A protein has these predicted regions:
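Nucleotidyltransferase catalytic core that binds NTPs
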Residues: 10-174
Length: 174
């Protein structure tokens, strides 16, 4: 299944998946209308989310609790490879990562971005709140300045110690 196919599917295209699952996947061309329809306030976060683990799920639930909707900007495969996470990363294709995220109750919408950072994507979404994990210095991120430029805010959420996809991959590879 190609990227456009997965991100462009709608309810009823695949009876094996609930309509709400596929409806959370959003291609960039549909983003403005889909964002407009979301309840406010909108919270936005981004990441690779290669092998989803407890730390990710806790973080996403915390992010959603800060607003009425949570939009996840997902690094495309090309974008993720540029982040230097190691050889063969991401392990899971962007389509699979997007579908896993969309299946989470806390996530309202998932969209891909190809750039190294989601700054351009933020201009489309214009969330009221941008969140990142506590392993980031939120004040130094360009995304923070962008969101604050239209009156939004940015916040770092506590990092859940002991959970890391990179560490998990290293452990598996021995």
């Amino acid at each position: 299944m190609g990227r456009a196919k997965c991100m462009g599917q709608r309810a009823g295209d695949n009876p094996a998946m609930p309509a709400t699952f596929l409806d959370k996947l959003c291609a960039r061309g549909e983003l403005a209308a889909r964002i407009q329809a979301l309840p406010r306030p909108v919270v936005f976060t981004n990441g690779v989310f290669d092998i989803l683990h407890r730390g990710h799920v806790s973080y996403l639930a915390q992010a959603r609790a800060l607003g009425a909707s949570l939009v996840v900007g997902l690094n495309s495969d090309a974008s993720a490879r540029g982040l230097g996470k190691g050889p063969g990363r991401p392990l899971n294709a962007e389509i699979d990562r997007a579908c896993v995220l969309a299946a989470l109750e806390s996530v309202s919408l998932v969209t891909l971005f190809d750039e190294p950072t989601p700054v351009e994507l933020l201009d489309f979404v214009r969330p009221q709140l941008y969140v990142k994990g506590g392993d980031y210095d939120i004040e130094t991120l360009e995304e923070t300045q962008r969101v604050r430029s239209w009156g939004g805010d940015a916040r770092a959420l506590p990092f859940v110690d002991g959970y890391s996809t990179t560490a998990l991959v290293q452990r598996i590879r021995g």
